Amino acid sequence: MALDIYSQWYPNRAPEPTDSPGEVASLPWTTAHSVALQLPSMCLLDFSRAAEGRPLLVCAPYALHRAQIADLAPGHSLMEALQKAGVARLYLTDWRSAAPEMRYFSIDTFLSDLNVAVDTIGPPVDLAGLCQGGWLSLLYAARFPGKVRRLVLAGSPVDVSVPSELSRMVASLPQQGFEVLVRQGDGIVSGKQMLKVWSIPFSLLDVEAALQRRLDRKSEDARALLDCFTHWDSDPLDLPGTYYLEVTDLIFRQNRIAAGHFVALGRKIDLAAVKLPVFLLAAENDIVVPPDQAFATMRLLGTRPAWLQRETEPCSHLGLFMGREALAGSWRRIARWLQSDLGETASERSRISA
């Protein structure tokens, strides 16, 4: 019965690709940058304004939407806000929409490319994971502890035993259904198909909540901003089937990261061994990753209490990354926290793990 219901969502035909292999996202970027590195799974974008300083790498989610979640529009760009807050060396992962040759890319593939990006920037880096970029960043910090100085987890699902809309949706669907979706796409999961299933259409009120501002349709600026959001929301990423099945099963169904059973690049990950400073940010009105789930990560870490920081922003899930007030408030405080002296010793900063 469950598979019959699932087949109504995914008709028996191969999905149309979201874009051609290698095609650059048509939505323009807001903040000036250069391409620092091109890897099989991503482009590493360099938003730096200086050659010196502590580097911050923002890890965008590789789930449904493109990396412009962190650079949507003027006044609604995390990258712009971090620059204004004094972060001089700044980078962003721009994950590629999956082409046929990427069908077997796994979580390990993305960790490997993230490691190359960090080595290119020069470790140790500060790492900020957005939504599902958070669990990837946490896995990376646990796998390569000496390469990450401080970690920011913003609206990030890790311990999915704490309920959320997203974890409930995954749990309600049989894993065979996800496998059918992958087979129908010849190993690629269509972003357009995912958009139909996972994303509820945004009302004007939803968009206003995400941007934390009123949008008067009579205003040309407001119409342009609404068009920008709509363009971003309707231009999803295709995902590698192997990666998609690992995420839905190992992370959201089996909860392996929180349980201590996840193996990353050949090594079992123990979150209690993560001892670096961590800042956790949650959205008060988040149904995707509610505060209880976002903050449940704290009890899994080995970080000393003085190095743990948590903050709740009165916004929706997307508001954490593009909301005008969140960017001017919580993210400015996060930038100050990254620049503050927490008393890490030189040995703790320089310890590199193979």
Give the predicted meaning of each segment.
Residues M298-L318:
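Catalytic histidine neighborhood in serine/cysteine hydrolases
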Residues I287-Q293:
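Conserved alpha/beta-hydrolase "acid-adjacent" motif
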Residues A128-S137:
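Gly/Ala-rich beta-loop-alpha elbow adjacent to hydrolase catalytic centers
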Residues A2-Y6, G122-P123, L136-T242:
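Alpha/beta-hydrolase-fold enzymes
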Residues P21-A99:
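Short, surface-exposed "cap/lid" segments of acyl-processing enzymes
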Residues V274, L280-A282, D286:
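Short beta-strand/loop motif that positions the catalytic acidic residue
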Residues M102-T120:
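Alpha/beta-hydrolase active-site loop
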Residues P314-G329:
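Catalytic histidine-centered segment of alpha/beta-hydrolase-like enzymes
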